[in-house]
Regions:
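Non-catalytic helical/linker scaffolds that mediate oligomerization, partner binding
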Residues: 1-306, 313
Length: 319
């Protein structure tokens, strides 16, 4: 209730054992009119046994390895971590890996090599986020811990395409929005797009695209401040506040203007825009547009009855 009153973005539920635990929390949030997403902290044997059922009703998961290692055998925890990450990726739901990531930095200014590898492997496995706890809550080197983890993540992501694990299988595409998200990933690759740009109110489209791990950034345009904050947790997504109306042309114009103004891609780059009709309705995504970002300096009539574009060159001399 406190979280609902203070407009929090996520509620992490501890010691989840079954899906009914999540349903009860959601009832409380809905009764309070809150839009917060629910993260299930996977830290009990029962939660692992009921993984699929819990995943159906939750918005994301956290692999809380500290308590999980107490309830289960130590040697089982690494594979459970990988299994939870994979299941979350298959459902397009964010997953956080937490606890003892850089534990030695509670006392020391540098992590062990094993801890560095632990962070890197969570990134390679496909986690949406890695989280510090004791290192920043009560450690001697909180700022250094954040800086160190950031460096490990950035370095790992430079070569992550070479080593990242792909899910053994993705679920069959059965919804229009999901199929469009899958297609957007492929189209972006074919046209060498600089970004995929979903127009989304709830954030659902951005999460669906993220599930397929495109090779370019996902610049999510949303009019909702809460959605903007929530999407900051999702893999590969850079959320932006952008006016989205029920008029598709106006919404596209707003998105492109923001991209140009903030220099989010280079002039001449292709972007893949995802939208749907009616705009603003969750799950309505059904269109893909490939647009080249450029400044229009002239317009004319095409004799071939289709849109044509070209690169304008400025001559500094007659030669």
């Amino acid at each position: 209730k406190w979280g609902a009153e203070n407009n929090v973005d996520y509620v992490a539920v501890s010691f989840v054992r079954r899906k009914e635990d999540i349903i009860e929390v959601r009832r409380v949030l809905e009764a309070a009119g809150a839009s917060a997403k629910i993260i299930a902290k996977m830290e009990t044997r029962q939660s692992v046994d009921n993984l699929d059922a819990i995943l159906e009703v939750v918005d994301g998961m956290m692999v809380a390895r500290g308590d999980l290692g107490v309830e289960m055998r130590t040697e089982d925890v690494p594979m459970i971590q990988k299994e939870i990450i994979e299941r979350c990726r298959m459902q397009g739901k964010p997953v956080i890996v937490a606890t003892q990531m850089l534990d030695s930095m509670i006392r020391n200014p540098r992590p062990t090599r094993a801890e560095s590898s632990d962070v890197a492997n969570a990134v390679i496995d496909g986690a949406d986020a890695v989280m510090l706890s004791g290192e920043t809550a009560g450690g001697k080197y909180p700022v250094e811990s954040v800086e160190t983890m950031n460096r490990i993540i950035v370095r790992t992501e430079q070569d992550v395409a070479l080593w990242c694990r792909k899910p053994r299988s993705l679920p069959a595409v059965c919804e229009t929005a999901d199929a469009v998200s899958h297609a957007a990933r492929d189209v972006a690759k074919e046209v060498a797009a600089a970004a995929i740009v979903p127009l989304t109110s709830s954030g659902m489209t951005a999460r669906m695209v993220s599930k397929y791990r495109p090779t370019c950034p996902i610049i999510a345009m949303t009019p909702s401040l809460s959605t903007w904050r929530q999407l900051s947790l999702v893999w590969g997504v850079m959320p932006c506040i952008c006016p989205i109306t029920h008029q598709l042309e106006e919404s596209l114009k707003n998105a492109i203007s923001l991209i140009k103004r903030e220099s989010l891609v280079a002039n001449g780059d292709n972007i893949v825009i995802m939208s749907g009709m009616p705009l603003g309705e969750p799950g309505s995504t059904n269109m893909i547009n490939v647009i080249r970002i450029a400044n229009v300096i002239a317009r004319g009539l095409s004799l071939v009855r289709r849109r044509v574009t070209g690169v304008a060159c400025k001559a500094s001399s007659p030669q």
